[in-house]
Swiss-Prot record:
Protein's name according to its UniProt entry: Extracellular superoxide dismutase [Cu-Zn]
Cofactor detail note: Binds 1 copper ion per subunit.
Positions glycosylated per UniProt: N114
Free-text function comment from the UniProt entry: Protect the extracellular space from toxic effect of reactive oxygen intermediates by converting superoxide radicals into hydrogen peroxide and oxygen.
Residue ranges, annotated region (Disordered): 224-244
Length: 244
């Protein structure tokens, strides 16, 4: 597009020079030719303006920071004796071509286990009419085996019933044809075997077990992310103070 714009500007310059030279010559060009040249120059300027405006829109889109929030709640179909997990999953993407980052802040896991691993994935549908069971399979727009699905976030370590984690460089996106907006994030009861379980379920969902809690990803402003970032920095400072 930039090359096309340069060519147009060059043509306008050449046309202007030709006209100027013809004005100084003996014969020159007739009035009709001059009017035709003026019209062509005007059309070229209009096209150039449109191109510049489109380039400006593209730059604005590339620079637009996107945010999303997912408010996790226990599955409506979950038996009462199961963990009641709640919390927030926040997303930030600096631009459509940037890698996604996410902040996970969940609680309600069994505290008596002290530490455990739980899988978290993006599922295809944002349908919670039957709790987390109606969110469908893993979101897999490219038809690849698990754990290469764009929303395969992997395993998260839970300590004392709490999960607090920040991850960067995630393969999924808030923009484009494979956006996860409107889709579900699901917290599982078990650990993801990362496709190494040796059965069909392993390459579909990692044998991650029951769906404990879920939410639907929706657009948001930056306030929740900024608040979470401040809290994360505060926790890091407190942790550093304890170790010194």
């Amino acid at each position: 597009m930039v090359a096309f714009l340069f060519c147009n500007l060059l043509l306008v310059a050449c046309g202007s020079v030709t006209w100027t030279m013809s004005d100084t010559g003996e014969s020159g060009v007739d009035l009709a030719d001059r009017l035709d040249l003026v019209e062509k120059i005007g059309d070229t300027h209009s096209k150039d303006l449109e191109i510049w405006m489109e380039l400006g829109k593209q730059r604005e889109a590339d620079a637009r920071e996107m945010h999303a929030v997912c408010r996790v709640q226990p599955s409506a179909m979950l038996p009462p004796d199961q963990p009641q997990i709640t919390g927030l999953v926040l997303f930030r993407q600096l631009g459509p071509s940037s890698r996604l980052e996410a902040s996970f802040n969940l609680e309600g896991f069994p505290a008596e286990q002290n530490t455990s691993n739980h899988a978290i994935h993006v599922h295809e549908f944002g349908d919670l009419s039957q709790g987390c069971e109606s969110t469908g399979p893993h979101y897999n727009p490219l038809g690849v085996p698990h754990p290469q699905h764009p929303g395969d976030f992997g395993n998260f370590v839970v300590r004392d019933g709490r999960l607090w984690k920040h991850r960067m460089g995630l393969a999924t996106s808030l923009a484009g044809p494979h956006s996860i907006l409107g889709r579900a994030v699901v917290v599982h009861a078990g650990e993801d075997d990362l496709g190494k379980g040796g059965n069909q379920a392993s390459v579909q969902n990692g044998n991650a077990g029951r769906r404990l809690a879920c939410c639907v990803v929706g657009t948001s402003n930056s306030e929740a992310w900024e608040s979470q970032t401040k809290e994360r920095k505060k926790r890091r400072r407190e942790s550093e103070c304890k170790t010194t």
